[in-house]
Curated annotation (Swiss-Prot):
It comes from the Bacteria. The keyword Manganese does not apply. Residues 127-144 have a biased composition (Basic and acidic residues). This is Uncharacterized protein YxeF. Disulfide bonds: none annotated. It holds the Pfam family DUF3255. Keywords: Signal. Residues 1-23 form the signal peptide.
């Protein structure tokens, strides 16, 4: 079978377009910067008995865990959320889901790899907790 020269160039052109289109497709987004476990940097309080507190952000939940005097590690009820906006400065705004959480929070990168969490008029600067293997915690839930 002989293909005319004009058709060969057409086929080559289509192949080139397909390669360019497939190469320009958006790559899968990397894990958001705020996923993982963060130390709230909370100083032990004289009355509440909380020694330390951590926050874990996953794909759709915020889980706070406190280490309390005499009780050990206590996980507070998780809060489901959704991302509602992202600013040009890289900060994101999340809204909590559920009847008791009509509130919003802002998460943004701080200096030296910290996370700034603004919620209920409070501003917390948190540092990432590294796992025992020395790697950053990436507690993203896997989808089933």
């Amino acid at each position: 079978m002989v293909i005319p020269l004009r058709n060969k160039y057409g086929i080559l052109f289509l192949i080139a377009v397909c390669i360019m289109v497939s190469g320009c497709q958006q790559q899968k987004e990397e894990t958001p910067f705020y996923y993982g476990t963060w130390d709230e940097g909370r100083a032990p309080g004289p009355t509440d008995g909380v020694k330390s507190a951590t926050v874990t952000f996953t794909e759709d939940e915020v889980v706070e865990t406190e280490v309390m005097e005499g009780r050990g590690e206590v996980q507070l009820p998780f809060m489901a959320y959704k991302v509602i906006s992202q600013s040009t400065d890289g900060s994101i705004e999340i809204q909590y889901l559920g009847p008791y959480y009509p509130l919003k929070s802002t998460l943004k990168r701080g200096e030296n790899g910290t996370l700034i969490w603004e919620q209920n008029g409070q501003r917390k600067t948190m540092t990432r907790i590294e796992s025992k293997t020395g790697r950053e915690e990436k507690d993203e839930k896997s989808k089933s």
